[in-house]
UniProtKB/Swiss-Prot annotation:
Protein family: Belongs to the EF-Ts family.
Entry-linked HAMAP family: EF_Ts (MF_00050)
Descriptive protein name: Elongation factor Ts
GO cellular component: cytoplasm
Region span, Involved in Mg(2+) ion dislocation from EF-Tu: 82-85
Length: 309
């Protein structure tokens, strides 16, 4: 086969279109004698063959996404290997498609088999994107929030495009309040608060009691070391537990937009203003990569990995 001249401009265009590596793009164009569309197919086929190898790689980057439709909201997390991919328009489109389907699917198992616009399932779509982007991708998790009446607030922090970013939050407010605009504004503010303050529960009764007892034990041991009488230690521990609750329980936290008031007090004031009860039924907070072990590599390992594909 005679030598085919492939310009750097075409290689760059193929890389931007597919997210594949520069050398992979150049080789694909050589193999297809410069045919751009055939080169895309070549990369996809090559990538599909290599998808099993990529599936073992740690994915701790990527994007979270939130979407609200009426009285239903969903949050998802789709992971990639590098932050670079999160800025890839193709990957962003994939995440948008998945979160749109999640509103109807309602469970992650149904979501994986849901059909995208190209009639491929979400699972198949992810595999195809592994092929063209050149990184392992995973639909890690999803959660749904539904209310019977009221408002759902959503907030995405560090957005790369609207509704896609590093932290996604939903907050459900059940209420018969007629002024939906003010109710939605409160739900939005509480969602922003949740993103920034990372509460562990709505109220103290729903807080993990194992966590509470662990903190209580730590506080007790610290107080005992100070040599105080037992009855004083008990009071000190209860005081520290109350402070702990004010740090991790949503309703007891100082409100981000008005720190002198707790979230509970802000809700009570809004109830008086709107003439209706307001109850936080659920909140969801997804932070990208939380709980995932990050793979540590030195520079030499990274270079070797790149050169060996």
């Amino acid at each position: 086969m005679s030598e085919v001249n492939i310009s750097a401009v075409v290689v760059k265009a193929l890389r931007e279109k597919t997210g594949a590596g520069m050398m992979d793009c150049k080789n694909a164009l050589i193999e297809t004698r410069g045919n751009f569309e055939e080169a895309i197919d070549f990369l996809r086929k090559k990538g599909l063959a290599a998808a099993v190898k990529k599936a073992g790689r740690i994915t701790s980057e990527g994007l979270t996404a939130a979407k609200v439709e009426g009285l239903t909201g969903v949050v998802i997390e789709v992971n990639s290997e590098t932050d670079f991919v999160a800025r890839n328009e193709q990957f962003q489109d994939l995440v948008k498609n998945i979160v749109n389907l999640a509103v109807v699917a309602k469970t992650i198992d149904k979501l994986k088999t849901s059909k995208m616009l190209n009639s491929k399932s979400v699972e198949e779509g992810i595999i195809e994107n592994i092929a063209t982007i050149g990184e392992n991708l995973t639909l890690r998790r999803m959660d749904i929030l539904e209310i019977s009446e009221g408002a759902i607030g959503s907030y995405v922090h560090n957005e790369v495009v609207p509704n896609l970013g590093k932290i996604s939050v939903l907050v459900g407010l059940e209420s018969k309040a007629k002024d939906k605009t003010k109710l939605e504004a409160l739900a939005k503010q509480i969602a922003v608060h949740v993103a920034g303050n990372n509460p562990q529960s709505i109220d103290d009764s729903s807080l993990d009691q194992v966590l509470v007892e662990r903190e209580r034990k730590i506080f007790f041991e610290k107080s005992k070391e100070e040599g105080k009488p037992y009855n004083i230690i008990e009071k000190m521990v209860e005081g520290r537990i109350r402070k702990f609750f004010s740090e991790v329980v949503l309703l007891q936290q100082g409100f981000l937009f008005e720190p002198r008031l707790t979230v509970a007090e802000v809700i009570k004031n809004t109830e008086k203003e709107l003439g209706a009860e307001i109850k936080i039924t659920k909140f969801i907070r997804y932070e990208l990569g939380e709980g995932i072990e990050h793979e540590e590599k030195n520079f030499a390992d990274e270079v070797t990995a790149i050169t060996q594909g």
